Amino acid sequence: MADKGSVAAKSLTNSAPLSIFSYCAASILMTVTNKYAVSGVDFNFNFFLLAVQGIVCITLISSLKQLNVITFREFNKVEAKKWFPIAVLLVVMIYTSSKALQYLSIPIYTIFKNLTIILIAYGEVIWFGGRVTNLALGSFVLMVLSSAVASYGDSNVDTGKLNFNIGYFWMFTNCFSSAAFVLFMRKRIKLTNFKDFDTMYYNNLLSIPILLFASLTTEDWSAKNIAQNFPEDTKYAVIASMIISGMSAVGISYTSAWCVRVTSSTTYSMVGALNKLPIALSGLLFFKAPINFYSISSIFIGFAAGLVYAIAKQKQKKEDELQLPTDKS
């Protein structure tokens, strides 16, 4: 019986469909729970929300390490000092992300998030000697087009123009801060040789004090404001969504590594592109996101853009691999 159980467990851990489904489910769960947490009337505890998520994340991965499920490096003051600027960028990125998600619908947020890819691509050209192929450029055009169509669709719906203008400001700020975070982290990872869970551990551990300090000094901790952010009828649901979103962040990291291990980087990149569609549609399903010709069209254009970009990156990777033997000869 024990042998049968171990065989069944091994079969599950090597299941490509299960790994793909788990990755998609974790991504959707995190987006939806984040949106729910910040969707309260006049919610203004963004720093506290992010601190709770970080604490949950650290608690969970530390527990998993104790159970020998995952491994990551022990805390090192020298490495922490070098990594601290990355943690500051992370705080800016996740704060602007939570503010954008607070004011924008999930489909709009997901579509505009694609613009970060363009900034990262050209950042890699400048700092890492990367290149942008014609196919990748075509995907960028589709990304910009999907964002323009989504914005036009939003402006034609009477849902509070001021809020959406503020949301776009936070969204563009998030795109630039996300690109900066990814590019600087990539450079630092090359120097430190950090693995996925090393990165998650240091990012969360170093950002928690910053987030708690920002929350205590800039957010209103009066009894009236706490009651406003955590109404009696939804208080426990909001707290649960904070905890679940922190857990799903760990889930995304774990399922990403799992997906790459049992499939391939090509399949993983395709899944990442295809996953944009269910995430955007979840906003239409669970929240009152505007539904019209333009909003639906923008989702599918953004979906196509992600797919074209994934294909472009894989094609570029194959071309680079074919050129390597030539360079050596």
UniProtKB/Swiss-Prot annotation:
Superkingdom classification of source: Eukaryota
Q: Which residues lie on this side of the membrane: Cytoplasmic?
A: 1-11, 62-83, 129-131, 185-196, 259-266, 312-329
Task: Please indicate if the UniProt record lists Iron-sulfur as a keyword.
Answer: no
The membrane topology of this protein is: Multi-pass membrane protein
Give the coiled coil ranges.
none
Q: Name one GO biological process term.
A: transmembrane transport
Residue spans, topological domain Lumenal: 33-40, 105-107, 153-163, 218-237, 288-290
Q: Where in the cell is it found?
A: Golgi apparatus membrane; Cytoplasmic vesicle membrane; Endoplasmic reticulum membrane
- Name the UniProt key words of this record, in alphabetical order: Cytoplasmic vesicle, Endoplasmic reticulum, Golgi apparatus, Membrane, Sugar transport, Transmembrane, Transmembrane helix, Transport
Q: Does the keyword Nucleotide-binding apply?
A: no
Gene Ontology cellular component terms for the protein in this record: cytoplasmic vesicle membrane; endoplasmic reticulum membrane; Golgi membrane
**Which Pfam families does the annotation name?**
UAA
Q: Where are the transmembrane segments?
A: 12-32, 41-61, 84-104, 108-128, 132-152, 164-184, 197-217, 238-258, 267-287, 291-311
NCBIfam families given in the database record: nst
Describe the family membership recorded for this protein in Swiss-Prot or TrEMBL.
Answer: Belongs to the TPT transporter family. SLC35D subfamily.
What does the subunit section of this Swiss-Prot or TrEMBL entry state? Homooligomer.
Known role: Involved in the import of GDP-mannose from the cytoplasm into the Golgi lumen.
This chain's protein is named GDP-mannose transporter
Protein species of origin? Komagataella pastoris (Yeast)
